[in-house]
Amino acid sequence: ARVEAVVKRVQAGKLGFIALHSAHWAKPFVRLMQERAKADAVAALPEAERATAQWQYLNEKPYRVIPKKGAPATPHVQKVGTVWRLTLPQCVFPVYRADGAPSHVATLQPTHPLAAGLPAKWDIPQTEMYGEPFWVPAPDSVIFEEKWDKGEHFRSGALWKVGQGDVFYFRPGHETYPIYRQAENLKVIENAVRWMGAEAARR
């Protein structure tokens, strides 16, 4: 019930939601991504079909299942007879490494409020690696991208509108390394709190 209350407040524009690192499987984040996937699926239909379309939702509890590399991505829509079948997002990625290798962060949208006061690029000396594809609905904006020397990359600062509210995911984290003692990473979180709080208060 508490998770659904959070989801409803975000959808109503009264609350912003920030997910950090392994919160990609936090129940509120998963539910918000499911609601965004449902909205995207409806929006992709011809307008005349949207009100009468029949839906079946699969994969409502995606927790702790990591897909194999090359598996079909989610969310995914398929029509079976007269029913639209939506496989909800897994909210995870097929590859990760906890070896503490450094990452290189690039600010892709320097004029966005989430990037205020941040450099064009910065390095995180030690971090866990998450590698694309990240199985979530396509973000409205990708503010930051992260890369590793072995070739992996990740949309490490992604922003979605869910209903009237904002959802922001910031990938860097892991309790083994001092990620949240680094000034740039803390500035991202500060910017997100200030901007999303102001947006919610304005509505």
Language model features: what each stretch is:
Residues 2, 6, 29, 110, ...:
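Stable alpha-helical elements in mature extracytoplasmic
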Residues 3-5, 128-131, 154-156:
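A generic local structural motif
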Residues 1-30, 164:
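Short alpha-beta junction capping motif
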Residues 20-145, 149, 203:
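An acidic, glycine-rich "communication" segment
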Residues 9, 132-135, 159-161:
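A general structural signal for short secondary-structure junctions and capping/turn motifs
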Residues 11-12, 22, 34, 194-198:
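Sec-exported extracytoplasmic/periplasmic mature domains
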Residues 140-141, 147-156, 161-203:
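Extracellular ligand-binding/catalytic regions of CAZymes and related secreted enzymes
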